């Protein structure tokens, strides 16, 4: 349960929350009789959870180890630190720290305006950029909705 509390159960759907706030819950739908998907489109690659810092991450890591799960060491992903483990059904879970955050290599007001990659992906920049769709963002559509830094 990763410190989540069961707050609702309807049929085969179970809703877990850490604090009851909107967006801070996970729904799990149990369908053990369906066929298992193959890796690719339409399947889950991994599920990521955020944690406050490396200290809370280490606590989660130790709990998972006590549950008998195989958990990775803490991995530095430059923008955050991650641990990974597979749940009994085979889905890869990630627990990532919020710090250091995505503003470590660009000013906050420019966040998201250009593609930033972790150092180990720079060698793949051309291939990554060529596979991305062109996004035509009309910034004027967002200024009236409280987005003042656009």
Where do the model's predicted regions map?
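C-terminal hydrophobic structural anchor segments
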Residues: 81-104
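Intrinsic, low-complexity N-terminal interaction/targeting segments
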Residues: 20-38, 59, 91-96
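Vicinal oxygen chelate
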Residues: 37-63, 81-86
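Cysteine/selenocysteine-centered motifs that mediate thiol-based redox chemistry or coordinate metal-sulfur cofactors
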Residues: 120-150
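Conserved blade-ending motifs and adjacent loop-strand segments that build the rim/top face
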Residues: 71-81
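Extended intrinsically disordered, low-complexity coil regions enriched in Ser, Thr, Gly, Ala
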Residues: 2-10, 56-62, 106
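Core segments of cupin and vicinal oxygen chelate
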Residues: 1-25, 76
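A short, polar/charged loop-to-alpha-helix boundary motif
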Residues: 101-118
